[in-house]
C-alpha cells in the first residue's frame, strides 16, 4: 500500500514537472512571437510617430478642441449611416472612394512630405515624446501582445473544434442564442453606438486611471460587505479554524513526542512526598546526587542556612560555632587583661601567642571528622554538608583574625608586654605545678613517702 502511494506521488510530481516545463516552453514561444510582431510593427510605424502621438493626445483630451471635433465627426458619420435611406450601392461606392483617397495619400503625397524630413528623423531619436503618452515601441509592444493573444485564442479554438466537434457546436449555439436574445431586447443600432462610445472613451479612462480610482473608493464598502478577495480569503480562513476546532483531538505527532521527552511529567504524589521529607531524611534525588559526587542543596537551602526551617532548634553548624565562642577574644579590656591605651586597638590578641592552639584545634577537628567517617560508615549528606560548612566557617574566621592581628601587631606591642608581665608569674607557677605531678606506682609511692613528707616540712 505504501509503495503504491509512493508511486502515485512520484507520478503526480512528474506530471507537474512536465506541465511546468510545457508552460515554460509555451511562454518562451509566446515571447518570441511578440518580439517578432513588435519588430515588424515598429519598422512600419516608425515614420508615423508624430501622427500617432497626435491621435493619442486627441483621444485623451490633451487637445480639447480637436477631441471635441473628432467626437462630433464620428457621431455624425455614425448616425448618417444609421439613419440614411440610401441604398447599399451608394454606401459601397462611398466606401471605395474613401479607400482610394487614403491609398493616394499614403503612396503619393505622404512620401513626398516625409522625404524632406527623413534626415532630421534619422538624426533625432524618436522626435516628440510625452511623459504620459505611449511611444511607438510601447504601442508596438501592446499591439503585438494583443495580436498574439487573439491569434493563440483562435488557434486553440480551431484545435478545440477539431478535437471536440460536439462541444464546439454546443458552445457556438449558446453564444449565438445569447446575442439573438440580446438583439431582440436592445436594437442593433444602440449596441453599435455603445461600442463606438466604448472605443472613444476607453483610452481616456486608462489615461486618467479611472478604474483604480473607482476601486479605491469602493474598497471599504466591499470589505464591509465581505465581497472583496481579501474578505473572501479571511472568511475561508475563519471557516477552516472553526472546522479544526470542531474536529476531535488526534494523537500527538512525532515532534511533540520528541519534545515531551525533554519535559518529563511529574507525579503529584511524588512531589508531595518530596515536600514532606524532614531535615533528617533524604530523598532519592539527594542520594543520587550524592553518589555522583556533588552536593545537593534541595528546597532552596544552602549549607549555611540549612537549619533555617526551624528557628527554635539550632543546627549543628550553629552549635559548633557557639562551642568555639570562648576562644574568641573579648573586647572588654578588664576581662582580657589588655590595657586599651591606643584607640585604634580593638583588643584582638595575636595568633602568634597561640600557634600551637590553632594547629592543635585543626588537627583535633580533622581527627574527629576522620573518626566519624570511619566509625559511622558512609555518612549522610546532611552531616557531610554541615561538617564541611562548619570547618570552612571556622577556617575563614581564623584567617580573618590572623590578618587583623598582623595589622594591629605594631600598635598592640606595648599592651602585650604589660600583659606578659602580669601573667608571667601565674604562668610560671602553673608550669611548675604541672611539672611536679607524675604518674607513680603504689610501690614507688610507698618508698618515696618519707622523703616527700620531709620535703613538704
From Swiss-Prot:
Quaternary data: Interacts with ATG8 family modifier proteins.
Residue ranges with Basic and acidic residues bias: 310-326
Parts of the chain that traverse the membrane: 80-100, 165-185, 186-206
Originating organism: Xenopus tropicalis (Western clawed frog)
Motif LIR motif: where in chain: 435-440
The UniProt record lists the keyword Transport: no
Residue ranges, compositional bias (Acidic residues): 428-441
Record-given protein name: Reticulophagy regulator 3
GO aspect biological process, one term: endoplasmic reticulum tubular network organization
UniProt function note: Endoplasmic reticulum (ER)-anchored autophagy regulator which exists in an inactive state under basal conditions but is activated following cellular stress. When activated, induces ER fragmentation and mediates ER delivery into lysosomes through sequestration into autophagosomes via interaction with ATG8 family proteins. Promotes ER membrane curvature and ER tubulation required for subsequent ER fragmentation and engulfment into autophagosomes.
Protein keywords: Autophagy, Endoplasmic reticulum, Membrane, Phosphoprotein, Transmembrane, Transmembrane helix
Amino acid at each position: 500500500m505504501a509503495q503504491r502511494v509512493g508511486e502515485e506521488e512520484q507520478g503526480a510530481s512528474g506530471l507537474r514537472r512536465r506541465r511546468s516545463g510545457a508552460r515554460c516552453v509555451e511562454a518562451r514561444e509566446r515571447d518570441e512571437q511578440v518580439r517578432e510582431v513588435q519588430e515588424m510593427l515598429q519598422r512600419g510605424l516608425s515614420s508615423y510617430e508624430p501622427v500617432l502621438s497626435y491621435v493619442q493626445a486627441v483621444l485623451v483630451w490633451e487637445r480639447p478642441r480637436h477631441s471635441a471635433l473628432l467626437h462630433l465627426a464620428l457621431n455624425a458619420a455614425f448616425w448618417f449611416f444609421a439613419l440614411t435611406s440610401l441604398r447599399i450601392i451608394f454606401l459601397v461606392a462611398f466606401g471605395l472612394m474613401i479607400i482610394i483617397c487614403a491609398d493616394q495619400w499614403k503612396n503619393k503625397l505622404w512620401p513626398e512630405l516625409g522625404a524632406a524630413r527623413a534626415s532630421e528623423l534619422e538624426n533625432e531619436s524618436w522626435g516628440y515624446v510625452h511623459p504620459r503618452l505611449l511611444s511607438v515601441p510601447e504601442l508596438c509592444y501592446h499591439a503585438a501582445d494583443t495580436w498574439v493573444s487573439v491569434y493563440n485564442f483562435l488557434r486553440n479554438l480551431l484545435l478545440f473544434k477539431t478535437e471536440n466537434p460536439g462541444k464546439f457546436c454546443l458552445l457556438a449555439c449558446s453564444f449565438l442564442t445569447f446575442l439573438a436574445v440580446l438583439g431582440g431586447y436592445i436594437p442593433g443600432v444602440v449596441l453599435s453606438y455603445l461600442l463606438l462610445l466604448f472605443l472613444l472613451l476607453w483610452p481616456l479612462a486608462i489615461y486618467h486611471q479611472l478604474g483604480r480610482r473607482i476601486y479605491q473608493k469602493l474598497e471599504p464598502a466591499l470589505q464591509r460587505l465581505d465581497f472583496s478577495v481579501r474578505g473572501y480569503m479571511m472568511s475561508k480562513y475563519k471557516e477552516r479554524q472553526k472546522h479544526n476546532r470542531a474536529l476531535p483531538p488526534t494523537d500527538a505527532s512525532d515532534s511533540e513526542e520528541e519534545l515531551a521527552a525533554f519535559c518529563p511529567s511529574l507525579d503529584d504524589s511524588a512531589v508531595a512526598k518530596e515536600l514532606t521529607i524532614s531535615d533528617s531524611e533524604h530523598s532519592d534525588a539527594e542520594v543520587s546526587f550524592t553518589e555522583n559526587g556533588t552536593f545537593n542543596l534541595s528546597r532552596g537551602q544552602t549549607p549555611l542556612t540549612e537549619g533555617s526551617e526551624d528557628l527554635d532548634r539550632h543546627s549543628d553548624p550553629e552549635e559548633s560555632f557557639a562551642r568555639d565562642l570562648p576562644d574568641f577574644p573579648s573586647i572588654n579590656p578588664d576581662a582580657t587583661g589588655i590595657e586599651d591605651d591606643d584607640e585604634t586597638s580593638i583588643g584582638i590578641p595575636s595568633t602568634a601567642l597561640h600557634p600551637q592552639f590553632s594547629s592543635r584545634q585543626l588537627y583535633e577537628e580533622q581527627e574527629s571528622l576522620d573518626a566519624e567517617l570511619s566509625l559511622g560508615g558512609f555518612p549522610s549528606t546532611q552531616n557531610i554538608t554541615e561538617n564541611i560548612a562548619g570547618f570552612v566557617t571556622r577556617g575563614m574566621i581564623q584567617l580573618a583574625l590572623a590578618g587583623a592581628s598582623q595589622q594591629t601587631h605594631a600598635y598592640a606591642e606595648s599592651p602585650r608586654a604589660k600583659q606578659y608581665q602580669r601573667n608571667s608569674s601565674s604562668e610560671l607557677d602553673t608550669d611548675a605545678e604541672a611539672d611536679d605531678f607524675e604518674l607513680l606506682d603504689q610501690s614507688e609511692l610507698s618508698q618515696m613517702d618519707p622523703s616527700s613528707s620531709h620535703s613538704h616540712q
